[in-house]
From Swiss-Prot:
Gene that produces this protein: MMP9
Written domain comment of the UniProt record: The conserved cysteine present in the cysteine-switch motif binds the catalytic zinc ion, thus inhibiting the enzyme. The dissociation of the cysteine from the zinc ion upon the activation-peptide release activates the enzyme.
Hemopexin repeat copies, ranges: 518-563, 564-608, 610-657, 658-704
Stretches for region Disordered: 431-508
Organismal lineage: Eukaryota, Metazoa, Chordata, Craniata, Vertebrata
Disease in which the protein is involved: Intervertebral disc disease: A common musculo-skeletal disorder caused by degeneration of intervertebral disks of the lumbar spine. It results in low-back pain and unilateral leg pain.
Protein name per UniProt: Matrix metalloproteinase-9
One Gene Ontology molecular-function label: serine-type endopeptidase activity
Binding site for Zn(2+) 2: C99, H401, H405, H411
Binding-site residues, Ca(2+) 3: D182, G183, D185, L187, D205, E208
Length: 707
């Protein structure tokens, strides 16, 4: 051995001993379903500059096609350092969530005036996001309009028809106007300048988490806070919580503080939970019973088994197979995940990740610092996950900005202005002097004396009086409320309530008008928990049960005055409670008393070769299958558009059913294909659609006597 070798070994050992210890690096994990952008900075800049009008303006000026001139335009418009370079400040601005209206130029498809020529502006809320209670959304829009009416002669009146000047819509991706949204973050909303038709309308990306800017809004029940919303984060026993918790309780009921510090304020309420109540179903809102038996198996949590629409449900007695009583489990915005591979599912706490147990959301395993959770108790084995809710975007502030566009304002270059294109949360007065000057340039000041902007508060859900525990640690089972709502909070109409069934005009009954004497119905649909049967301008209602008979007939025109006498198919989307009525090449959409339509089928993405829609079946959350003859398509209810790639032959998905059915509908979670007086019933077992019964509509479904 060389004389140098021992010395080298000694130096190596000493080097190891005296080297500074390395900082432990977090393990980075590739999460299944994680969407990552592969855009380079240059590609991001090119796309951004084109989308928001800078490239086109630079080219129109005859300037070079390098990014420099367009970057200078952007930097000047956004009040950034004017370097003409793709520097860090410019890239940061490009990555900031913002309005989708171009900064230079307008949505080029539309022409129109830059202001309204009347001062009483009407608006219609066409649909809602599920992120906030409807009352909170209504209030956010009303307060946003109030900002502009406080400094101008304008007034804003809510109406319930598409004739409104400003139609407000939540949508995702391509939502019908040719300017698609881009998923979560990025482009938040857009609006069109004043004018007829779609002009003046404001659209909000429903892939965002809409809040009041300070986290998800979770209304509480019971407790001692009079239904106030949860305050996130809150302190309990010295620890910070950003979601509802069961800590401190022995009954498993999730609760939250309604102030920033429970330890000092002692104010709390219970979060939505299937252990408190259920929604819809047939159990009058009673809470889930765990465990319960379904198809011979025991369940200790809400499940989607047995359903094709993805809704979580539970039995409200110990044995569903025997009692047939159930309800749908309420969702909690504070723990409903976004993205990942389990969007819409709930976080499960505690969960195991890399052998360690987590009782809150974590950023472990990620290089971007985003909080996530598992949606099963063990990520290591199941690999199911999603991002935890963040602070969300203030619907009030974004709406106020978009309504500025709907009134005729362009983007401002003042970073503190409401009309600056980038989202900025503030709890101070939103309007800057630049905003006020701009809107008054169009409409003038409010007539003197000019009142102060009205002070409004967000309405909070009320809770029924109850004997409440003095704090979250415990509650006696007998004190736990069992009465729940008969339907989900979001199930209300977007307009004035429609007249109840008892007010519908009953047509004088004759033997020919008895539903049991109708050979072929025009359309059949399950609406609510009843079966509706339509024929020649009339309809009947049927509730299943021993000795039940169809009620009616009633006039279609009394309940849905916009509809024609002859209908081809009808369906209800359960989540939004929208009713879709198809007749020939047209469709009408009712939301409460409000109606949209008639619209042509091509607006839904169905070609001119589709003469009618003959039926619909649920196909996952917010999705339907639309039928016409031998073909079917997958239909996105929220976007109101079919996926053209989903076209398929009926007999490929539903072997054994007639190919010339005149009506397809869903009833009690099974599919019915009608031909003449008969139906073919299809049930799904092991992901296979199989005909399990053939029968008469009148005798076997409506329980009509056979004499």
């Amino acid at each position: 051995m060389s004389l140098w070798q021992p010395l080298v070994l000694v130096l190596l050992v000493l080097g190891c001993c005296f080297a500074a210890p390395r900082q432990r690096q977090s393990t980075l994990v590739l999460f299944p379903g994680d969407l990552r952008t592969n855009l380079t900075d240059r590609q991001l800049a090119e796309e951004y500059l084109y989308r928001y009008g800078y490239t086109r303006v630079a080219e129109m000026r005859g300037e070079s096609k390098s990014l420099g001139p367009a970057l200078l335009l952007l930097q000047k418009q956004l009040s950034l350092p004017e370097t003409g370079e793709l520097d860090s400040a410019t890239l940061k601005a490009m990555r900031t969530p913002r309005c989708g209206v171009p900064d230079l130029g307008r949505f080029q498809t539309f022409e129109g005036d830059l202001k309204w020529h009347h001062h009483n502006i009407t608006y219609w809320i066409q649909n809602y996001s599920e992120d906030l209670p409807r009352a909170v959304i209504d209030d956010a829009f009303a307060r946003a309009f109030a900002l502009w009416s406080a400094v101008t002669p304008l007034t804003f009146t809510r109406v319930y028809s598409r004739d409104a000047d400003i139609v407000i819509q939540f949508g995702v991706a391509e939502h019908g106007d040719g300017y698609p949204f881009d998923g979560k973050d990025g482009l938040l909303a857009h609006a069109f300048p004043p004018g007829p038709g779609i002009q003046g309308d404001a659209h909000f990306d429903d892939d965002e988490l809409w809040s009041l800017g300070k986290g998800v809004v979770v209304p509480t029940r019971f407790g001692n806070a009079d239904g106030a919303a949860c305050h996130f984060p809150f302190i309990f026993e010295g620890r910070s919580y950003s979601a509802c918790t069961t800590d401190g309780r022995s009954d498993g009921l999730p609760w939250c503080s309604t102030t920033a510090n429970y330890d000092t304020d002692d104010r709390f309420g219970f979060c939505p939970s299937e252990r408190l109540y259920t929604q819809d179903g047939n159990a009058d809102g009673k809470p889930c019973q765990f465990p319960f038996i379904f198809q011979g198996q025991s369940y200790s949590a809400c499940t989607t088994d047995g359903r094709s629409d993805g809704y979580r449900w539970c039995a409200t007695t110990a044995n569903y197979d025997r009692d047939k009583l159930f309800g749908f489990c309420p969702t909690r915005a504070d723990s409903t995940v976004m993205g990942g591979n389990s969007a819409g599912e709930l976080c499960v706490f505690p969960f195991t990740f890399l052998g360690k147990e987590y009782s809150t959301c974590t950023s472990e395993g990620r290089g971007d610092g985003r909080l996530w959770c598992a949606t099963t108790s063990n990520f290591d084995s199941d690999k199911k996950w999603g991002f935890c809710p963040d602070q969300g975007y203030s619907l009030f502030l974004v709406a106020a900005h978009e309504f500025g566009h709907a009134l005729g304002l362009d983007h401002s270059s003042v970073p503190e202005a409401l009309m600056y294109p980038m989202y900025r949360f503030t709890e101070g007065p939103p309007l800057h002097k630049d905003d006020v000057n701009g809107i008054r340039h169009l409409y003038g000041p409010r007539p003197e004396p000019e009142p102060r902007p009205p002070t409004t508060t967000t309405p909070q859900p009320t809770a029924p009086p109850t004997v409440c525990p003095t704090g979250p640690p415990t509650v006696h089972p007998s004190e736990r409320p069992t009465a729940g709502p008969t339907g989900p909070p979001s199930a209300g109409p977007t307009g004035p309530p429609t007249a109840g069934p008892s007010t519908a005009t009953t047509v004088p009954l004759s033997p020919v008008d008895d539903a049991c004497n109708v050979n072929i119905f025009d359309a059949i649909a399950e609406i609510g928990n009843q079966l509706y049967l339509f024929k020649d301008g009339k309809y009947w209602r049927f509730s299943e049960g021993r000795g039940s008979r169809p009620q009616g007939p009633f006039l279609i025109a009394d309940k849905w005055p916009a509809l024609p006498r002859k209908l081809d198919s009808v369906f209800e989307e359960r989540l939004s409670k929208k009713l879709f009525f198809f007749s020939g090449r047209q469709v009408w959409v009712y939301t409460g008393a409000s109606v949209l339509g008639p619209r042509r089928l091509d607006k839904l993405g169905l070609g001119a070769d589709v003469a009618q829609v003959t039926g619909a079946l649920r196909s996952g959350r917010g999705k339907m299958l639309l039928f016409s003859g031998r073909r079917l398509w997958r239909f996105d209810v929220k976007a109101q558009m079919v996926d053209p790639r989903s076209a398929s032959e009926v007999d490929r998905m539903f072997p054994g059913v007639p190919l010339d059915t005149h009506d397809v509908f869903q009833y009690r979670e099974k599919a019915y294909f009608c031909q003449d007086r008969f139906y073919w019933r299809v049930s799904s077992r092991s992901e296979l659609n199989q005909v399990d019964q053939v029968g008469y509509v009148t005798y076997d479904i409506l329980q009509c006597p056979e004499d």
